[in-house]
Each structure stands twice: as structure tokens, then as C-alpha cells.
Swiss-Prot record:
Family membership noted in the UniProt record: Belongs to the class I-like SAM-binding methyltransferase superfamily. RsmB/NOP family. TRM4 subfamily.
Protein name: RNA cytosine-C(5)-methyltransferase NSUN2
Keyword Oxidoreductase: no
Top EC group: transferase
Keywords, ordered alphabetically: Cytoplasm, Cytoskeleton, Methyltransferase, Mitochondrion, Nucleus, Phosphoprotein, RNA-binding, S-adenosyl-L-methionine, Secreted, Transferase, tRNA processing, tRNA-binding
Gene3D superfamilies: Vaccinia Virus protein VP39 (3.40.50.150)
Broad class of where this protein is predominantly found: nucleus
Organism: Xenopus laevis
Role, per record: RNA cytosine C(5)-methyltransferase that methylates cytosine to 5-methylcytosine (m5C) in various RNAs, such as tRNAs, mRNAs and some long non-coding RNAs (lncRNAs). Involved in various processes, such as epidermal stem cell differentiation, testis differentiation and maternal to zygotic transition during early development: acts by increasing protein synthesis; cytosine C(5)-methylation promoting tRNA stability and preventing mRNA decay.
């Protein structure tokens, strides 16, 4: 084997030209000397293309190019729905931002971080520091550690400024049903979840987010992002966005199609607006990327507006500056919608943001640099690469009525950001092709009680019915017909398994099932008694990921997501949903209850708990966070008194702020803990402990 590899290596060396051999040696030498040469930030075709399109105002081209060659500044966003967001902001301002202007890195004086003028409540900040400098500089190590720990705990998100724009324009309310079509890696999804939980006093908002991505591996990155926020209102699914299935929900005894109030359509794009952070784009950029993605972008956006509710809002966005991926897609949607869609004027919703209006005239260029003014000029040989929808409409009056000036193009040099495009669409009526959709014709069902029918046939018919069971849609008003089974009782199957093995090929890897607890499940009564759960506690929203054996962990979803899960198990590939609220003790029921509380779900569960609660002071919180298993004597007398009245087992540790003492911590804190024989300990992740200590006590 070794001799064969040597022969192959020699053969490859002999086949190289002298110039190739010289380049290879140069690369190896550069690697030995400490790294490869930097990518030259220059692309003549890119400059020629955008200068011809005139998307940059006259006299600003040099500033535009200079900005693209500079590294992207670091931007952070403070999680808005957390009750201690104001405390985090105060900590950043007083303990970190004030020190930064006194620090120099590589001879460069650091500017004081500034809030993004257009983001609400000063919850987003940017600095002239790049992420690389923050990571590598010893002078900024303390600041970097704070950012890392706060990011892991979900209190801060490090997110590019322009990527914060689409969720803001969605104008999310807590009751909205939301679809994020291309969600990974999940920073925008996290922002949407925050908006759903704007009122922390409501543990289960009526709305929810279904976050989808076509890449199975990136779905797990999405799960990691969402888990930081500990929401019971998020579901991660794995589908091709251009054919994401239409889901069903039960409403007043009938099954109807789920239409979303808000849809985020952040489509795959060529990414030439990200040159400041993805420097590979400089050498790889051609117009071919945009031409190849245009069709997919239209299909995804079309599927989005089909599933949008009337009066709903869809935000279409790309990190590309190319009109083939931007205005051309919007024009195609508006044209075939026949008045069902309109562009919304959202300029007033982002005061302080600088942006350029959408353009109405552009040309299409091939990767070789050949220009085409209109579709009729394109030779037949190019028809597979260039499509009619890539060009502006010939009807100028119709084009003008589309109000493309309401589209927003963000240029990097205007506010030191990346490049971005965003448009907001409002659905006024059903799409034309949905209006023409005929009613579904149903064949009389085969009764499973009919002894004359072979059991195998009955089973096959039942399987087919389960897969194809969609409600009949009224072609005139989009309403659905009531759906009942033959016995007159509603379907209450509590097991949401993945699709059958034959269908599983469509969806990729098999996931564990989602099994909801039944109303009379014996494991719930001891839990309810031990923690004195309120009768209003929605126990039917508890689920586990196993059908057999002991239930080690219990998760919780909102009522609305339970509805979605129960009626669509055959249609969708669910990667993750719900938050962990209870974990099984290693010692079983030795301490009064077989399940202890989980920190991830405590903010959702706490409003229903009426027992096992210790009210603690700030000093007690410090003891809990800095000591692993402190004795009772370490706590205040009041805490010791409360603890003496509790048996061993899982407990809630609650800190309530005192408005009469404004100099003390002014946000509530809820921690999970364990009352031992002579001690109390907190069940809080190590990183979460660190960040709590940092912003409360340091």
C-alpha cells in the first residue's frame, strides 16, 4: 500500500507543469512561514457589474468599495424578553463599555460602543472592533469571556446588524403563528422567539414559531440556538422550503389548514453582501451564482405566500445586492399574484436606518460579462441559464404600480454594516391558483368493521387515508369542511411518531417519537401532589421522547404546538420541540417524587408551582452560585427557617427585588435547587452560574 501511494505521488509530480510546481512550492513555503498569503480583496467583474447597474449613488463608489474591504464591526444584541435585560444593559454600560475607550489594540484606539439607532430600546450595540480582535487581544479577554458566557446562557446574541432587520419588520405579536422557512443558523429565529415572549408574565403565549431548514445538520445548530431561550413555543423541522408541507390543525372539532400570520423568507443567496466577513466571496464571485439561485428563490417565496394568512405579512430578504435575486423575485411574485399581494411601506418602522429604495430597471449579465437588456435578446442556447423572470416587466405602468421603491437595499458604507436587501409583502386575498383549486373529492370510506373485507385491505386503506387525510377546501372562501371519524368521536392519539419507514426515505434520518402523556398517566399524580401544581396546569402538553421503558425526561410544549404535532405526524420531520421541565431522579421516589425540576423550563413551570419554594436574598444567591454544595448554616436565618420546613428533594429558589432599595438587583431570579439533609445546592449549568455572578456581583 505504501509503495503504491509513493508511485502515485511521483506520477502526479511528473504530470505537473513547471508553473504549477512553482505555485505549489510557494504555498508550502507560505504555510511554513506562518500562514497563507491574504486574499486580495478585488474582483473586476464584481465592480464592473454593480457600476453598470448603478445601485450605488453617484460619487459614493469609492466609499462603497473601501467599506467592503474593511472587516465587519462586532455587533451584539441583548435578549429583549428576559426580565433582566435592563440589568445586562446596565452591566455592559457601567462595567465594560466605559473601560473600552482607554484600551489600545495594535496601536488602534478603541471607540466606545454605540447603540444601533434604529433598534428598539438600545438593545443592540456595535463597536469598531472585529470579532477576531475581541477573540485574540489579551486586553479584551475579560470582555470576551463575558460575551461568551452571556451568549451561551441566551442573554446576549452576537449577530450581524443587518440580520436583525427582518424580524423587526415582521412586527411579531405574542399571538402570531410564525413560519421561518430557511432558519439556520438561527439568530433571526431567536429574535422572533424573544418577541413572542415580550410579556414574561405569560409562560405560554398563544403564538408559536415553526423553524425549518433543508439541511439536517444545520437543523441541530438551529436547535442549539433556540434552546438558549428556553421557549415551549418553538418547533424545528427539516424540509425543503420550496415544498414545505401544508399543515393541519383542529379548530372547534374540525380540521383546517394552518395559515401563518407571519412568515420570514430569508432565502439562500449568493451572499455578495457578506464580503466583509466571508472574504472567499472576493475570488469566487460571478453572476452565475445569482442566475442559478433565482428559480429556487422564487419557488421558496411562492410557497411562503401560499401559506400566509390573509392580512398576514411575509418578509423576503437576502444578503445579496443583486437585483436578479432581489427585485426580480419580488416582481415575479407580485405579477403572478394578480393583486393578491402588495409591498408594504415600512420606512417609518425603522427610524434611523439608512437604506436605498428598490430599482425598477436592471440588466442581466452572464459570468463571461455578456449583457442582456431583455428576454428577447437571450439566445436559445442560454435559455436554461437565463429565465424571463430575471428581467424587469415590459409594462412600465404595471411595474410602477408595484411600488418597488418600498424595497430596502442596505449598502455597507452608509452605516458600517454588511450589504442586505429586504421587502415586506402583505397578503390581501388568496393567491389566484388557490382560488381556482377545486374541492377535493372523497370516496366513501371502507368500514373497518366490515367482515367481508380482508384485514390486509382494510389496513392498507387506513394507512392511505391517514397519509392523504386533508380537509376539503372551499374554493370560494378557503374554509374547510368539518372532519369527523366514523364513530363520531374525535381522534385523540397521543403518539406523534415519525412517518412510516417507506415515507422516511423522503425525510432523512429517523428521530425519536414525541409521546404526549395521557390524562390518566400514573406518573403525573405524584408530581402534581409534590409540587402542589395549580389545577390550571396543562398536563396534557407534557411529552416524552420514548414509548417504552421509564420516562427519564419530561418536556412541555404550548397548547398550539401540541395541536400541530398531533395532526401532522405523517407529514413533517420534527427535529426538536418543547423544553425540558422535569428529570427523573437517580433514586426514584425516595425523596417524595421521582422527578426533579429542570432549570431549562423553570420559567414556564414556576407560575403553576405552589409548594417547595424558598424565597432567598441576594447574599443567598451568591452563596448558591459560588459554592458547589453549601451547608444550611451559610444561608440567611430566614432561608434556614424556610428550609427546615421542607423535606429533602427538588426545590425552587426565588429572589424577588425590593423596589424600596433601587441600589440592589432589580430583576427576579428563579433557580432550581435541591434540599439535602444538611445543605442546599443549585442545579444550574456552570456557564450560567458564571454569567450570573459576573453581572450581579462583579
Amino acid at each position: 500500500m505504501g509503495r503504491k501511494n509513493r508511485r502515485n505521488r511521483q506520477r502526479r509530480t511528473e504530470q505537473r507543469s513547471p508553473a504549477e510546481e512553482e505555485r505549489r512550492k510557494a504555498r508550502e513555503q507560505a504555510a511554513w512561514e506562518g500562514g497563507y498569503p491574504e486574499i486580495i480583496k478585488e474582483n473586476k467583474l464584481f465592480e464592473h457589474y454593480y457600476q453598470e447597474l448603478k445601485i450605488v449613488p453617484d460619487g459614493e463608489w469609492d466609499k462603497f468599495m473601501d467599506a467592503l474591504r474593511e472587516p465587519l464591526p462586532a455587533t451584539i444584541r441583548i435578549t429583549g424578553y428576559k426580565s433582566h435585560a435592563k440589568e445586562i444593559l446596565h452591566c455592559l454600560k457601567e462595567k465594560y463599555f466605559k473601560e473600552l475607550p482607554d484600551i489600545e489594540v495594535d496601536g488602534q484606539k478603541i471607540e466606545a460602543p454605540q447603540p444601533l439607532s434604529w433598534y428598539p430600546e438600545e438593545l443592540a450595540w456595535h463597536t469598531n472592533l472585529s470579532r477576531k480582535i475581541i477573540r485574540k487581544s489579551p486586553e479584551l479577554e475579560k470582555f470576551h469571556q463575558f460575551l461568551v458566557s452571556e451568549t451561551e446562557s441566551g442573554n446576549i446574541s452576537r449577530q450581524e446588524a443587518v440580520s436583525m432587520i427582518p424580524p423587526v419588520l415582521l412586527n411579531v405579536q405574542p399571538h402570531h403563528k410564525i413560519l421561518d422557512m430557511c432558519a439556520a443558523p438561527g439568530s433571526k429565529t431567536a429574535q422572533i422567539i424573544e418577541m413572542l415572549h415580550a410579556d414574561m408574565n405569560v409562560p405560554f403565549p398563544e403564538g408559536f414559531v415553526i423553524a425549518n431548514d433543508v439541511d439536517n445538520k444545520r437543523c441541530y445548530l438551529l436547535v442549539h440556538q433556540a434552546k438558549r431561550l428556553n421557549s415551549p413555543c418553538i418547533m424545528v423541522v427539516n424540509h425543503d422550503a420550496s415544498s414545505i408541507p401544508r399543515l393541519l390543525i383542529e379548530n372547534n372539532g374540525s380540521r383546517e389548514v394552518l395559515y401563518y400570520d407571519r412568515i420570514l423568507c430569508d432565502v439562500p443567496c449568493s451572499g455578495d453582501g457578506t464580503m466583509r466577513k466571508n472574504i472567499d466571496v472576493w475570488k469566487k464571485w460571478t453572476t452565475l451564482n445569482s442566475l442559478q439561485l433565482h428559480g429556487l428563490q422564487i419557488r421558496i417565496a411562492t410557497r411562503g405566500v401560499e401559506q400566509l394568512a390573509e392580512g398576514g405579512r411575509m418578509v423576503y430578504s437576502t444578503c445579496s445586492l443583486n437585483p436578479v435575486e432581489d427585485e426580480a423575485v419580488i416582481v415575479s411574485l407580485l405579477d403572478k399574484s394578480e393583486g393578491s399581494l402588495e409591498l408594504a411601506d415600512v420606512a417609518s418602522e425603522l427610524p434611523g436606518l439608512k437604506w436605498m429604495p428598490g430599482i425598477t430597471q436592471w440588466r442581466v449579465m452572464t459570468k463571461e460579462g455578456q449583457w442582456f437588456e431583455k428576454w428577447e435578446d437571450v439566445p436559445t442556447s442560454r435559455h436554461t441559464q437565463i429565465r424571463p423572470t430575471m428581467f424587469p416587466l415590459k409594462d412600465e405602468e404595471k411595474l410602477k404600480s408595484m411600488n418597488l421603491n418600498r424595497c430596502m437595499r442596505i449598502l455597507p458604507h452608509h452605516q458600517n454594516t454588511g450589504g442586505f436587501f429586504v421587502a415586506v409583502l402583505i397578503k390581501k386575498a388568496p393567491m389566484p391558483w388557490n382560488k381556482r383549486q377545486p374541492k377535493l373529492q372523497r370516496r366513501p370510506p371502507v368500514s373497518v368493521c366490515d367482515a367481508s373485507v380482508a384485514p390486509e385491505i382494510v389496513k392498507a386503506v387506513a394507512d392511505i387515508s391517514a397519509i392523504a387525510d386533508e380537509p376539503a377546501v372551499d374554493a370560494e372562501n378557503g374554509e374547510t369542511k368539518p372532519c369527523t371519524n366514523q364513530s363520531g368521536s374525535s381522534k385523540t392519539d397521543s403518539v406523534c411518531c415519525p412517518p412510516p419507514s417507506k415515507k422516511m426515505k423522503l425525510f432523512g434520518f429517523k428521530e425519536d417519537p414525541f409521546v404526549f402523556l395521557s390524562e390518566d398517566d400514573p406518573i403525573f399524580e405524584p408530581i402534581q401532589k409534590f409540587y402542589a401544581l395549580d389545577p390550571s396546569f396543562p398536563k396534557k402538553n407534557l411529552l416524552t421522547r420514548t414509548q417504552e421503558g421509564k420516562k427519564r425526561q419530561l418536556y412541555m410544549v404550548s397548547k398550539e404546538l401540541r395541536n400541530v404535532l398531533l395532526h401532522n405526524s405523517e407529514k413533517m420531520k420534527v427535529i426538536n420541540t418543547g423544553i425540558k421541565v422535569l428529570c427523573r431522579n437517580n433514586d426514584g421516589e425516595q425523596y417524595g417524587c421521582a422527578y426533579r425540576l429542570a432549570q431549562e423550563g423553570i420559567y414556564s413551570l414556576y407560575p403553576f408551582i405552589n409548594a417547595r419554594i424558598l424565597t432567598v436574598s441576594v447574599e443567598d444567591i451568591k452563596v448558591l452560585l459560588t459554592q458547589e454544595n453549601p451547608f444550611l448554616s451559610k444561608f440567611s436565618k430566614e432561608t434556614q427557617k424556610q428550609a427546615n420546613n421542607l423535606d429533602m428533594g427538588s426545590i425552587v429558589l426565588k429572589y424577588e427585588p425590593d423596589p424600596q432599595q433601587p441600589e440592589t438587583l432589580q430583576c427576579p431570579i428563579v433557580l432550581c435547587g435541591w434540599r439535602g439533609k444538611t445543605s442546599i445546592r443549585s442545579f444550574v449549568f456552570f456557564l450560567h452560574r458564571i454569567n450570573l455572578v459576573q453581572w450581579i456581583f462583579i
